[in-house]
Each structure stands twice: as C-alpha cells, then as structure tokens.
Amino acid sequence: MGSSGSMVKPISGFLTALIQYPVPVVESRADIDKQIQQIIKTIHSTKSGYPGLELIVFPEYSTQGLNTKKWTTEEFLCTVPGPETDLFAEACKESKVYGVFSIMEKNPGGGEPYNTAVIIDPQGEMILKYRKLNPWVPVEPWKAGDLGLPVCVGPGGSKLAVCICHDGMFPEVAREAAYKGANVLIRISGYSTQVSEQWMLTNRSNAWQNLMYTLSVNLAGYDGVFYYFGEGQVCNFDGTTLVQGHRNPWEIVTAEVYPELADQARLGWGLENNIYNLGSRGYVATPGGVKENPYTFIKDLAEGKYKVPWEDEIKVKDGSIYGYPVKKTIHS
C-alpha cells in the first residue's frame, strides 16, 4: 500500500523506495564516476528521509547512461563485481538497506557485454546478479543473459527476483521468477515514452498472473534524444496498482509491501490461482490435474525449435537499422 505510513518500516513486510533517477548524459568515464557518487548520495539521503526504508531501487542505465556511441567501449563498461559495485555495497552497508543497481558489464569471457542488475544486502554482500535475458533489439547491442533468473531472500519475508526493462514484456520471464519462488518481482527500466502504457500494463499483468508484487521504476527526464517517463509503479499481487509515480525526475515512489499476503493467496486461493493451475489443469475432473504440456510453443522453445508461422517474412532481424554490423554467425 501507499499511504502516509510509507515513511516508516511497517510491522510486517517492508518499505521500498523507487528512485525516478534523471537520465544521465554521460560522455566520459568521469561522468560515470559522478553518477556513482550521486547514487551513493541518494541512498544516504533517502534513508535519512525515510528511516524505515529497507529496499531502494535505481532504474536501468542510472550508472552509465545511454550514450549509444560509447556504451560498449572499454572506458564505459564495468566488471561485476568490481570497484563500482564495491562502492554501492559500502553505501548499502552504511545505510542498512538492500539496493538494486544497474551495470553495463564487461563480458569476462570476451565478446559482447551484458546488461546486468545486482542486489546488495545491508551487510554489503552481493546476493543476486542477473543478466538481461531479452535485450531490447534492435536498439541494444547486449549479449542475451546466461545466468537464468535467480531468486534471493530479501526484507520482510520477501523472495526477490529482478528483470530488466524489456524482459517484463515477456510473460514467461515473470512466470519463471514466480515458479522459482519469488513473491516480489523488481523491474528496472530505461524506456522512452513510446511504451509507457504497455510498461504499466505488463507490470500489472505480471503481478496478477503470478500472485506476486511488482516493483517497477524507469529513468525520468530528457537526454537530448528521448524523454524517459519515470512513473514508478508498485502493483499488488491481485494486479491492482498500489502506488503510481508521475513523470518527474527525482520523484521518490514509496510503498509498504507485504509479501506474506502474496504467499497466503498462493496457498489459499482456489479461483485464479493460476501459477498453480497451469500445471494442474482441470483438477476437479481429474484428481491432481492434467500434467502433460499442451502448448506447442513451450515444447518447441525447449527443443530450440521455436519459430512463428510468419518468421520468414519478418523484416528486421539484425541491428543494421541502428548502425550495428550484420553478423553472419547464427547461434545454434
């Protein structure tokens, strides 16, 4: 819920703050260092204003910005863990909060970099590392993530998962998080205004279809090319919006989150307990439900044979429209 009570720690559950961080205009490594210090300052100042704060979330690209001419260069990329995450970890430890941060990560094995998110706990430990499974093609050059969708224990009875921006447009990503036990899905984004309605819609549907809370926040402001919509959103496990931010840079969207209620719904609901019902179809007629997979796309995806009927007619299948070189190697 969002209320005047969203200034202090609730008796159960936890208090979160979603930071509608101003989109950084980054031209050099020095600019990145300034953003890191600004993020650290924001952690401390937000904690001082909201003493009960336990989870603070920064949007995608808040650390390194979206300079598409430089974002894959050695100067702009970071290692994870590395000096940057060490600084975030120290800030989380000092302020006694969980923090969610965005890092464009140098590929430790060489090759294309990753778009990465981390969760750091109040002891300064990195407890989750996630690489974006679904880069926003054809705009983004990031390599598709290879760490799956990890889940970690968070504050107030929460089990946390993180997805990044475009990931949230795929219902399969939210379902994977819930299937692995997450009762809170965090979505950090760097979308421009063209998809703001769809962003809010999928935040709600991801919550409802999986009986979990969704905590979502986007960059805010203008970087000289696009306007980023902010609009931090906290959705209840029934798909309703508890709190909705506006388009203001630096707006702090706070909410009280009660993971135990999502857990109770998953255990106690009959109607619309769809995260369970998916694997127990028709359990009234068939005790225990039908377990066999009826879905062609799931079978084909699992076998590496996913192909839509119109695939041969699709016009855009590489990044050339945004100036990326066309690569001939096809992943098998």
Curated annotation (Swiss-Prot):
One family name in Pfam for this protein: CN_hydrolase
**Matching PROSITE patterns:** CN_HYDROLASE
Q: Which reaction is catalysed here?
A: formamide + H2O = formate + NH4(+)
What are the GO BP annotations of this UniProt entry? putrescine biosynthetic process from arginine
Q: What class of enzyme is it?
A: hydrolase
Asked if the record carries the keyword Repeat, the reply is no
Q: Which domain of life is it from?
A: Bacteria
Tell whether NADP is among the UniProt keywords.
Answer: no
Which GO terms of the molecular function aspect are on file? formamidase activity; N-carbamoylputrescine amidase activity
Q: What is its EC number?
A: 3.5.1.49
Alphabetic keyword roster: Hydrolase
User: Where does the CN hydrolase domain lie?
Assistant: 14-259
Function of this protein? Is an aliphatic amidase with a restricted substrate specificity, as it only hydrolyzes formamide.
Q: Family, per the entry? A: Belongs to the carbon-nitrogen hydrolase superfamily. Aliphatic amidase family.
Report the protein name in the record: Formamidase
Q: Which species does the entry assign this protein to?
A: Bacillus cereus (strain G9842)
